[in-house]
């Protein structure tokens, strides 16, 4: 299988490349810039540096690579950024998506396209609606969520109107090594690693600890992407999550249990988010029925992987 990954130097992209290589696929990648993620890529992959805002570039990629599968991971992935820069978030997430779909039509591509939406498409869900199935109405409550609804529905539209082979993935929170420290697990783990290395005071800064989220290790999410491309049904949407919700408080406690230091926890107002819902977790039965997918890495082991990554980073920062 010739697989093209957009955003290959991003957090998820590098992990997906490893998963697909492990499945014997030929992997090609495209990235907006060289980026820090380049160092983690398998040396056999040299990504094309290109701007997916340009339609002609995507047509050339399709001509040159002739992919059997396209995993569209590129985009602006952080909810708070979407409050600060809503228009940029919409442009960065919607335009490349539309360009890829239109390029596939123009080039009569029969590739299977995996669109990465998000649990943020569901947005404002009541606790009584848990777990969230793919039938739950889409009520995004931030600009990032709106951009992801648009990507998801553009995929559906091009499947219905042009017969494109599209799968719509709706991953819930994923965590793992190399994730940006703006995300909660990475943020806490990095702070602990920096404190252990003597690079920071023994205080960990946190936001809302009561929120409960469905966290899946990035490797398990990437395996789900690969399985959906192999076995999913064209046009369908699939939730990806463990089906369990863990509080941010518990996430913090697990990470703190991995260190011998005594660390003060300090809640900060600027780490609180507007419109934060208290709990969300996935009904993943559709994904499991279609592919047999099961998560393989426990929440606790996943957090240990994150902390070990930041400990290694702290060591190299101390030199």
Feature locations, PLM:
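C-terminal "lid/loop" region of Rossmann-like NAD(P)-dependent oxidoreductases
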Residues: 203-204, 208, 235-238, 246-253, ...
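Non-catalytic, hydrophobic alpha-helical segments
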Residues: 221, 225, 240, 251, ...
């Amino acid at each position: 299988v010739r697989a093209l990954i957009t955003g290959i130097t991003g957090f998820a992209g590098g992990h997906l490349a490893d998963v697909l290589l492990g499945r014997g696929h030929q992997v090609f990648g495209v990235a907006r810039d060289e980026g820090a993620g380049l160092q983690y890529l398998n040396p056999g992959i040299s990504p094309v540096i290109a701007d997916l805002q340009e339609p002609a570039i995507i047509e050339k990629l399709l001509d040159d690579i002739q992919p059997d599968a396209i995993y569209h991971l590129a985009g602006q992935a952080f909810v708070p950024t979407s409050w600060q820069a809503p228009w940029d978030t919409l442009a960065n997430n919607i335009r490349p998506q539309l360009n890829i779909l239109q390029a596939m039509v123009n080039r009569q591509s029969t590739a299977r396209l995996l669109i990465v939406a998000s649990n943020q498409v569901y947005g404002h869900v009541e606790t009584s609606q848990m777990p969230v199935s793919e039938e739950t109405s889409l009520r995004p409550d931030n600009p990032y969520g709106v951009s992801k609804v648009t990507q998801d529905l553009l995929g559906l539209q091009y499947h219905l109107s042009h017969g494109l082979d599209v799968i719509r993935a709706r991953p819930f929170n994923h965590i793992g090594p190399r994730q940006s420290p703006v995300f909660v697990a990475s943020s806490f783990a990095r702070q602990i690693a920096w404190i252990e290395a003597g690079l920071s005071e023994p205080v960990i800064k946190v936001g809302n600890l009561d929120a409960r989220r469905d966290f899946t290790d990035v490797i398990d999410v990437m395996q789900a992407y690969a399985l959906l491309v192999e076995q999913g049904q064209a046009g369908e949407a699939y939730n990806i999550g463990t089906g369990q919700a863990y509080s941010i408080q518990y996430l913090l406690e697990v990470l703190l249990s991995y260190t011998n230091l005594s660390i003060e926890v300090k809640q900060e107002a600027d780490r609180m988010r507007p419109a934060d819902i208290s709990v969300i977790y996935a009904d993943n039965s559709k994904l499991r029925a279609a592919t047999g997918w099961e998560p393989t890495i426990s929440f606790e082991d996943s957090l240990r992987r994150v902390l070990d990554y930041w400990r290694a980073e702290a060591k190299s920062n101390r030199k």
